[in-house]
């Protein structure tokens, strides 16, 4: 078994991790790189793998830096199941078509400039139809249920309180009679927030892939922030 980091390694956006095992490969997230991270081969749509070879895709949450390349993945040949929580699947039903609309608008704007300059026209990274095609592959799952992803691979989604539907994903890979447990944290939320539940911690792992966007600082307690806002308002 191997884990390959195809995105969000030494950068913040573009989460995409590949697990390769005896039976093939699966992905955890397929996000769009944004800002300075966008100017890379992956950010321009060149996957470091063959999309049609991927058995399944698991999504931690709906934010575009974790899902924004899913329509392109499908456009390039991926046709496997996409597993996410039910809430994430519904949010992607809004966000992926919206992202496709932006891609189409950007291409249209660029082509107006290219026509005036006598340059070749460009195509959008993906279209609204590509987004709709990808949404047909989503399979909503419940928190805390162990599901089979493909032969030799199981997974469980655990609430991490980042946004509605967000999850850490525990993946069990069985090969050669040995079961290995890998935990992908996704983006982790904070305790004591309204509406969103507090993060839950999976019980142990052989390997942990942990987000570290704010790993070098301590957050102010939510109640202290509320008190400060209340005082400044009054």
Predicted regions: what is each one?
Residues 2, 16-28, 46, 180, ...:
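Catalytic cores of nucleotide-enabled group-transfer and carboxylate-activating enzymes in metabolic
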Residues 2-6, 20-21, 141-200:
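Catalytic core of the metallo-beta-lactamase
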Residues 9-11, 21-80, 84-138, 188-199:
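Pre-active-site segment of Zn-dependent metallo-hydrolases
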Residues 42, 223-229:
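Charged helix-capping and loop-helix junction motifs
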Residues 171, 205-217:
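Gly-rich Lys/Arg/Thr-decorated short loops/hinges at beta-loop-alpha junctions or inter-strand turns
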Residues 196-197, 219-223:
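Short, solvent-exposed loop/turn segments at secondary-structure boundaries
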Residues 231-234:
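Conserved small/polar residues in nucleotide/adenosyl-binding loops
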């Amino acid at each position: 078994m191997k884990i390959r980091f195809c995105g969000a390694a030494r950068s913040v956006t573009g989460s995409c991790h590949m697990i390769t095992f005896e039976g093939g490969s699966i992905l955890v997230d397929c996000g769009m790189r944004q800002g300075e991270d966008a100017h890379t081969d992956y950010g321009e749509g060149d996957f470091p793998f063959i999309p049609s070879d991927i058995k399944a895709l698991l999504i931690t949450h709906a934010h575009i830096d974790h899902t924004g390349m899913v329509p392109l993945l499908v456009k390039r040949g991926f046709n496997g199941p996409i597993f996410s929580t039910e809430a994430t699947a519904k949010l992607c039903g809004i966000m992926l078509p919206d992202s496709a609309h932006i891609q189409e608008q950007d291409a249209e704007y660029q082509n107006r400039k290219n026509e005036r300059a006598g340059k070749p026209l460009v195509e959008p990274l993906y279209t609204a139809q590509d987004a709709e095609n990808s949404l047909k592959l989503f399979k909503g799952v419940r928190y805390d249920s162990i599901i089979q992803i493909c032969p030799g691979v199981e997974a469980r989604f655990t609430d991490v309180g980042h946004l509605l539907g967000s999850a850490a994903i525990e993946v069990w890979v069985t090969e050669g009679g040995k079961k290995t447990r890998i935990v992908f944290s996704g983006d982790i939320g904070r305790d004591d927030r309204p509406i969103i539940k507090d993060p839950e911690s999976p019980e142990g792992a052989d390997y942990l892939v942990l987000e570290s966007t704010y790993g070098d600082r301590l957050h102010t307690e939510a109640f202290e922030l509320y008190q400060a806002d209340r005082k400044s308002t009054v």
